[in-house]
Amino acid sequence: YDPCDYLKAREMQLKRDNPQWRKRPLDDMISMKTGITGQKGRVVYRITPCINDKLDDIAAKTSIRNEQIQLVCNVIDQQIHAAYEIFNRGKEFDDYIESRIAMINIPNKDEAFLREKLYEMYNYPVINHQKAISQNI
């Protein structure tokens, strides 16, 4: 889990409701503290295969430095996303999302919007994982 998920969803609604809204310096401090001390759920560390061959391919493909950097970033992202551990999400995940929405205290709280944004946050890793394993860069 992302301990800052509810803070991110809160910020999304505040920006949606008021495009002029800006975070206060205290908001960043709260996010950092929450990120460091908050519950992260299950964490899996994996070592991915060596990418030296892919780096050689990139060097042969283009000599333009910015293009090389972007291609290297793409390879690294693909390796990370392909190695994701995707956990089953059932009723307890729905309960978790509802508990995160309950933590958001803002005027005109739009629970449907917040719920959608929280689910999107947690679905991106699944989408990225599926894309990475199908690409096989």
Tell where the protein language model's regions lie, with residue ranges.
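Membrane-interfacial terminal anchoring regions of lipid-handling membrane enzymes
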Residues: 1-137
